């Protein structure tokens, strides 16, 4: 097996603070606030406008998605993604650092990290500890809007990192890939409802294994060490030497599985973009498992 040199998936708050202090934010280094919150809770863009990491732009995941899809957070086209990030001053040569303001330390940032990778961009990192720890450690913030000079970003979809409904359905027969679901246990089992979901019962895809993404984070909001991450996968009998598909409700926290595996030296985890929100609406009933009222999701 050839071991490729992996780009650093995490950068520290100290490293980013020093990079900002030394004036490195610009065409070669861009910072993105990728916060998103459930409607009626926090307002991500408003919070960004009030305070953010100096030089950071707001990455609106509601804008940078396939808005024509009936499913929740499907990838945009190559052209849409390229135009969107190009307008944030990002070229194919830019090192991109992504963070969010979630209380967990990280929630949506790994989704944007994966989006860059699935569109062919290697030099992207998540801010370890997120905005929560940036603030806690007393690093500078600003309300000043960021106005980066637009750049040209050519997006090239890496289909090996993305799985479709048809591919996951075929995998139920072939079992070539392990299927790992990152949602909380109750939602996976079908004993707790999907939050803010209309017409979407909880449950899981037959044959999937549950590894809740919160397990990858420390109480302080940092990513656990590669040794701890490996132990989490091993405990659930997930073999990191074998192919793996990550799934969740809408393709967001599945990216935490991709990130955790990457930190263990496995960069090839594919994400099922439609995840449960698509599977529940399209898949045959016998492929949907739930311990809820009806027994089948």
Curated annotation (Swiss-Prot):
GO terms for cellular component: mitochondrial matrix; mitochondrion. The modification N6-acetyllysine is found at residues 14, 136, 163, 175, 224, 236-237. Pfam families: Rhodanese (PF00581). Glycans are attached at residue 35. One of its GO terms (biological process) is epithelial cell differentiation. One of its GO terms (molecular function) is 5S rRNA binding. Keywords: Acetylation, Glycoprotein, Mitochondrion, Phosphoprotein, Repeat, RNA-binding, Transferase. CDD domains: TST_Repeat_2 (cd01449), TST_Repeats (cd01445). Its EC number is 2.8.1.1. Contains two rhodanese domains with different primary structures but with near identical secondary structure conformations suggesting a common evolutionary origin. Only the C-terminal rhodanese domain contains the catalytic cysteine residue. Together with MRPL18, acts as a mitochondrial import factor for the cytosolic 5S rRNA. Only the nascent unfolded cytoplasmic form is able to bind to the 5S rRNA. Involved in the formation of iron-sulfur complexes, cyanide detoxification or modification of sulfur-containing enzymes. Other thiol compounds, besides cyanide, can act as sulfur ion acceptors. Also has weak mercaptopyruvate sulfurtransferase (MST) activity. This is Thiosulfate sulfurtransferase. It comes from Rattus norvegicus.
